[in-house]
Structure formats: C-alpha cells, structure tokens
C-alpha cells in the first residue's frame, strides 16, 4: 500500500480550496483519506497555506510520498529541513526550533 500526501479539492465551481491529506494512492482524489494535515486556499491574496508540521514530518519519516504541489509547499514551509534535522545528528528539540526559525528568517530576508 503506497501512501501519498496530496491535495483534496473542496469548495464550489471556480472558488476551490484544498485540504492537504494523507491517503492511499489508489483511493480517489476526493475519497477516503487517513489524516488531514492542512489546507491551501488559492483564492486569498496572498494565498493561504496552513500545515501541521509535526504530522507532516511524521508521515514523511514513515515513507509517505508527497505530490509535486505538496512537495513545493513543504519546501516553502521548511518541513523537509525539519525532517533533515530530526533524522541527522542528535540535537535537542529547542536547537531544532532555533535552526528552523533562523532558516525562515533568512528566507524572508532573501525574498524581499
């Protein structure tokens, strides 16, 4: 059973928003899912992304494969960086949070 992290379409015609879900790769796009880990709303300006980082990292460590769109969200939010810090050398959770916060601040400065 292959597990995917993907978008599930919600909303009405031309006003779609998406929930980020973990599901079996064989289930339909809007069908049964294992867990909801966030949402994406492209209708707001700027768009809104909310992801439960701990759940996302947990599923990535278990081997779930994100789709291309979800992977780009994870890269923007620093989820892959947190997974890298957790799987590497043993460091405390406070140090992980400090490094993640510094990474996000550096990213904000670069994009201004």
Curated annotation (Swiss-Prot):
**Which GO CC terms are listed, alphabetically?**
cytoplasm; small ribosomal subunit
GO MF, one term, reads: structural constituent of ribosome
- The answer on whether this UniProt entry bears the keyword Metal-binding reads no
Q: Which UniProt keywords apply?
A: Ribonucleoprotein, Ribosomal protein
What's this protein's family per the entry?
A: Belongs to the bacterial ribosomal protein bS16 family.
**Which PANTHER family does the annotation name?**
30S RIBOSOMAL PROTEIN S16, SMALL RIBOSOMAL SUBUNIT PROTEIN BS16M
Its recorded name reads: Small ribosomal subunit protein bS16
Q: Which organism is it from?
A: Karelsulcia muelleri (strain GWSS)
- What broad taxonomic lineage does this protein's source fall under? Bacteria, Pseudomonadati, Bacteroidota, Flavobacteriia, Flavobacteriales
């Amino acid at each position: 059973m292959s597990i995917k992290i993907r978008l599930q379409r919600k909303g009405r015609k031309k006003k779609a928003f998406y929930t980020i879900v973990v599901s079996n790769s064989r289930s339909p796009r809007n069908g049964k899912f294992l867990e909801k880990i966030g949402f994406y709303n492209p209708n707001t300006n700027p768009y809104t992304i909310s992801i439960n980082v701990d759940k996302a990292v947990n599923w990535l460590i278990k081997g779930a494969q994100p789709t291309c769109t979800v992977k780009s969200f994870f890269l923007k939010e620093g989820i892959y960086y947190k997974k890298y810090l957790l799987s590497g050398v043993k460091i405390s959770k406070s140090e992980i949070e400090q490094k993640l916060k510094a990474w996000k601040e550096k990213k904000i400065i670069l994009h201004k």
